[in-house]
């Protein structure tokens, strides 16, 4: 028998239809000895209590079995475990550690409970009703005046404008899924944070414009607890929704996604202020979003060299959604997501990794020629992923402006791609590249783990130049023109794989030079386009809408050098062939 409970060996009231005819009641700790089988409001599920009077405990230190009463000031020196909490007699409880509590938190008028930055309140009973106001402190990363942060409140009753009173009122925003816009017009002086909803809030107007510094937000209200539903929208034009952690504790991203897999896809997007919006509301090239799913996470690596904090590296999400943090999800349909107490966790600092499962990751960054990273993508070989599109393991590319790299699965551009185990060195992963500014760029490995910690190489094959580069040892620099290129780059793991299609033999392409003209033919199929590049990736010649299996190219206008013919067939299959161009 559990401590604090006894058996009533008398048969319960058989006339009560709510009680089984042969029931014998277990009573105590919240159940009265009246055979009605219900928990009465005038009873407590907690057994004994202990009181802190400002100097000492009346009945030993707090445990899960005790109702803990603070009638004097107390500052935590370690984690606190309690069945219930009462703060009374104008006392102040300051939490510098985690509070684990089974039942309710009661804070009398004139008393205070303060949860400092990076501390959790883990509440178990989803039906427990909290009363009184909790103050939660949350520090931002270093920000300047024009930076925005996505916030969500861990308490109810927090006025939106009062949260950051020095922020201009028209710089508080909600996100509208139907129009894909941030709106300030829907908010007013009476607006309060809604539980589970994310808000974009600019830094206070008295924050320095050029010296980055942390800013501390103060939430004040009744701590949220229990199941919190939030409606999401999937429209024909957009399915991104801005949510937020509604609890005064860290949220386990994997549990949240798994519990709501019928309603949302598995990738979460976290806004980072790595890029500064200009006066016209436009962001420079790059991405402001870090991402996470079951495969792993990517950083918002893009930086604005004009941002005072541009040298500070962005953090890769680790599967923990912090207190007060807003984030984007993709809705599969119109429906409801549920935040629950079982998703709450005390995991603060440790990387979220399934250490008992096999996994192999590579993180690729693309950078401008001056070395500034533009964006980051992840390819991971992990348990649970397949070679098809998996919404929990493949994350769609989102929030990019200007030049950016992505991997491709089917026709879907991805920032995270999960691949099936076991790892096979013959695997190939196509990459896509969007360029709006011509010039030289570099693809490099940012990090790797698993099998890649050993001798397994990672190559970038450039179909336009016909080169294959081991980027574990040497970043690959290429020249790019404006456009979208989904057939140029491939990640491979074996250097000598055929540069031609596996379905098309090399001798199916015939290229020869005569009188400064190139004769190109594909006897077995029709050509659509031909582009000719030098080994630096510069476009030398382009011919489109060929619709023939033979063509003559003249007036190439280049000196003696190796060039690469990049041929697109009628079925959109690419072929790359190196040819030596000789001047007659």
Q: How should these model regions be labeled?
A:
Residues 1-47:
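Membrane-associated feature with strongest affinity for ZDHHC
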Residues 88-180:
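Acidic, glycine-rich segments characteristic of secretory precursors and extracytoplasmic regions
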Residues 45-128, 182-183, 187-188, 196, ...:
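Extracellular beta-sheet-rich ligand-binding/adhesion modules
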Residues 38-51, 494-503:
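Low-complexity, Pro/Thr/Ser/Gly/Ala-rich linker/spacer regions in secreted
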Residues 567-569:
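Conserved structural position at the C-terminal beta-strand
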Residues 45-60, 115, 137, 148, ...:
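Boundary/junction segments of secreted and surface-exposed precursor proteins
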Residues 27, 46-58, 168-180, 271:
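Short beta-strand segments and strand-loop junctions that repeat across beta-rich extracellular domains
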Residues 187, 193-194, 202-559, 571-580, ...:
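Compositionally biased Ser/Thr/Gly- and acidic/asparagine-rich
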